[in-house]
Structures are given as C-alpha cells and as structure tokens.
Amino acid sequence: MKLGDLEFWLLTDGTFRLDGGAMFGVVPRSLWERVSPPDGRNRILMAMNSLLIRAAGKWILIETGAGDKWDAKSKDIYSFEGSPRLPEKLVARGIPPEMINIVINTHLHFDHCGWNTRLVNGEAVPVFPNARYFVQQGELDHAKAPTERDRASYFPQNFLPMEKSGQWSLLDGDAEVVPGVELIRTPGHNRDMMCVRMSGGGKTVFFFADLIPTAAHLPYPWIMAYDLYPLTTLENKKKWIQQAAREGYLVIFGHEAENPAGYLREKNNKYALEPVELDS
C-alpha cells in the first residue's frame, strides 16, 4: 500500500496461541469466546504481524516475530505455526536481511523481537547486520531487569546481542525515525511500549502493537491481564480509537490473525472494524 512516497507491506511470522483468560483479563470467557474461540487448552489463535516499509530510501521492519530459538516444551506451550517464517518472506520479496536499514521493536516481549537474532554455533547474533534497532531506553532497561510478573516475556538472547554489536538506537519518548514514520510511546501494556504512525499522501496508518492486540480487544474494558498498567491502557485505548475513527486512520493490529487491518466505525459510542485487504 502506498502513502505518498512511502510504501508498506503486511507480513507475518506465523501464528501462536496464548491463554484466552490471560488475553482478555476480567472479561468472562462466556463473552470473549464468542469472538475468539479457544482450543481445548483454553488458548486463542493469534498472528505475529510485522510491517515492511520503504521510506526515505530505507528499508524498515516493524516487529520481528517470535524467532526460532525455542525448545520443544515452549513450542508445545505456544503452538507456533506457519511457514515460511519472517526472514524467508523477506528474502522471497528480494529483501535479504542485509538490506534492512532500520528495525523497530515496539517493545521487547519475545513475540515482537524474536528474529532480532538467530543462533550461529550456539551464539545469538543479529539477523539484520546493517540495521539500527530502535526501542525505548526505558524498555531495554526494564527488559534487562524485569519483575517477577513479566520476566517470562523477556529473552535476553533477543536484545543483548545488539549491545555487543553496537546496533541499538535508544529513544526517550516519541520520535520520527524517517519522514512519515513516527514512533509514539504508548504506556499501558508496559511502561515504554510504542505504537507506530505512518503518514503520506493525505493518508495515515496506525499500528496498535499490544495496545489493542486484536480486533476483539476494541471494547474499552477488554484489556489483557498481561498489561502492567491497565488503567493507562484504558486511557490510551480511548484516545487512539477515537482519534483513528475521527480522522480515518487505517489501523493494523499486532496479533489479529483473521482481519489484521481496517477502518474503525463508531455507532452509539461503540467501535467496530471494517476490514480491508492489504498487500503482503
């Protein structure tokens, strides 16, 4: 899809499953299972969506999926599926990892930065050797010293190698990495997660990351139990849902498997997705 001089494509690193109760927090299963049917282990299906962007003469990748550094037990817990994986999809488009100039991690949970690195002779090394990796300074600091509540979401192999290679570009607040691609600190899920806004040609696209992970999470109180600051999530959901609907943003969800993109339509102060197909 083109936005003026900017062009982007929706990619995915496949699907995985997480517990539906954890994904919908205080919402009763009798409600959420109508829109996200669970499997026999109470897990719902989710995608790991990424965006490939061409802007200002650079190749930019937003999110790097779950990667492949998983043991058999973890693969069973999360039921990773999908082939080819993200790096192979880039190569199929004629974009080998060496061509990526910028990698944006909205945050450093394992399902958003897994292909930051891969194992070579047992050592995790950057997949994108010529890229600058962007994340909030506060998120990297927290990832290196997480709490007991969220420690399982962070894998040091996904982010420490970029310190060794000197590839981190650390942010302190909002930033425009190239003209038309803006990173917006949006706390709630954690303190320093970011959403991404792309603009050009009179159009705007908003990538929700984990602020609103799926279309089923559009109702204001449908907030993940994983969120460290749920009331802040609530405030930011209201702000960005209303703004996206009012200004006609095309929105993209980080984990929506069925209808990952579309426009928000409001009726009686409730919002629904009008899905659209994107190039992939």
Language-model features: locations:
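Active-site metal-binding loops of divalent metal-dependent hydrolases
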Residues: D13-T15, T64-G67, L108, G138-E139, ...
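Metal-dependent catalytic neighborhoods of phosphoester/phosphodiester hydrolases
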Residues: C113-E123, Y263-L264
